């Protein structure tokens, strides 16, 4: 029997029962729960343990059906709050708290209420901030930290990142947004100026040849199409970035190259070949980053703009390099030559990879 919960303003207790490999759950009211326990003790069980805030109890049933009840008092624990069955998700940016850039970007109104049609964007922004929250210990509080966001687009997430790190968490951050669309850059700089975000700047340019900084603490790349993601990742490694957050898209390169006789029954179907190629591309990227001294994870990221769900590669610099041999064997077996592999090896040979 589990803990209390509130369903439609009625306090219920949940019981779980295992039948074979299935776990069945059922909710009971107080009276129904007592009847359920009595029935189970009479028919199926000989011992019942209960834990309470002040008293713990044990009910023992003999073979003849005699019940013995033992009680033990203990210090009162902190009161446990009854959980709502459908509890509200606790977001980092909370509904009801007006945030200037979310208002101007049409995600919420001036009272802080989320616009219904933009709720998916609100969830996406908060999910992204959760990824950042996990890596906060890697960001220094003793100096200014530099974050470069390539492919910032309309910059929902760039503004959210600045607001979260500087306004909510108190980090001294300098965030640089790069994009190839001039009109987007002008609008974002105008908004940053309006909000007084003095260390948030947007520039027209490509991360592959960006030389505006010599050292970057975190690189964010969202929806850099196809091999643009690889150039961004290679640049991040070159800078020795402590953290990399990347949401790739349009992974076409491997789809054009992949050949493997054993996998031909799968690869002959276009849609399966496309999906497999995308997954292989991101797995290889993560493995290559590990070979350059990063600990990597591939996580699910909500993204309504491109696909219902997407993947995010999160890499944290450890300095411990993994063996690249297994990756190279797989690349050879699949006849693929990823751009990131070439870029990282070129940088290694030039001696510029840290």
Predicted regions and their residues:
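Conserved class I S-adenosyl-L-methionine
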Residues: 143-153
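Short helix-capping segments at alpha-helix termini
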Residues: 167-171, 194-197
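Class I S-adenosyl-L-methionine
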Residues: 8-31, 35, 65-67, 76, ...
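Conserved SAM-binding motif I beta-strand of class I
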Residues: 172-179
């Amino acid at each position: 029997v589990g803990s209390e919960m509130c369903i439609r303003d009625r306090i219920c207790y949940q019981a779980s029962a295992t039948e074979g490999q299935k776990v069945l759950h059922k909710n009971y009211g107080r009276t129904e729960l007592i009847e359920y326990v009595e029935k189970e003790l009479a028919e199926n069980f000989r011992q019942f343990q209960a834990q309470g805030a002040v008293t713990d109890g044990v009910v023992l049933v003999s073979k003849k059906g005699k019940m013995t009840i033992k009680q033990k008092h203990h210090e009162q624990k902190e009161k446990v709050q009854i959980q709502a069955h459908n509890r509200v998700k606790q977001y980092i940016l909370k509904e009801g708290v007006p945030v200037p850039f979310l208002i101007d970007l049409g995600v919420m109104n001036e009272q802080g209420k989320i616009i219904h049609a933009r709720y998916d964007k609100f969830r996406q922004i908060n999910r992204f901030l959760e990824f950042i929250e996990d890596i906060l210990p890697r960001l220094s509080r003793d100096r200014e930290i530099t974050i470069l966001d390539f492919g910032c687009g309309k910059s929902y997430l760039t503004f959210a990142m600045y607001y979260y790190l500087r306004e909510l968490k108190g980090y001294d951050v300098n965030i640089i947004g790069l994009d190839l669309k001039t009109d987007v850059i002008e609008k974002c700089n105008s908004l940053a100026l309006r909000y007084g975000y003095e260390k948030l700047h947007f520039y027209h340019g490509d991360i592959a040849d960006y030389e505006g900084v010599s050292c970057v603490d975190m690189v964010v790349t969202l929806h850099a199409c196809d091999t643009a993601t690889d150039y961004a990742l290679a640049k991040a490694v070159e800078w020795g970035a402590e953290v990399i957050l990347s949401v790739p898209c349009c992974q076409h390169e491997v789809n054009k190259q992949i050949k493997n006789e054993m996998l031909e029954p799968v690869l002959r179907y276009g849609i399966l070949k496309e999906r497999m190629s995308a997954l292989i591309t991101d797995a290889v990227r993560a493995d290559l980053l590990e070979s350059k001294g990063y600990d990597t994870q591939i996580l699910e990221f909500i993204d309504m703009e491109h696909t219902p769900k997407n993947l995010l590669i999160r890499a944290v610099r450890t300095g411990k390099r993994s063996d690249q041999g297994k990756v190279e064997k797989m690349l050879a077996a699949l006849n693929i030559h990823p751009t990131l592999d070439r870029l990282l090896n070129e940088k290694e040979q030039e001696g510029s990879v840290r």
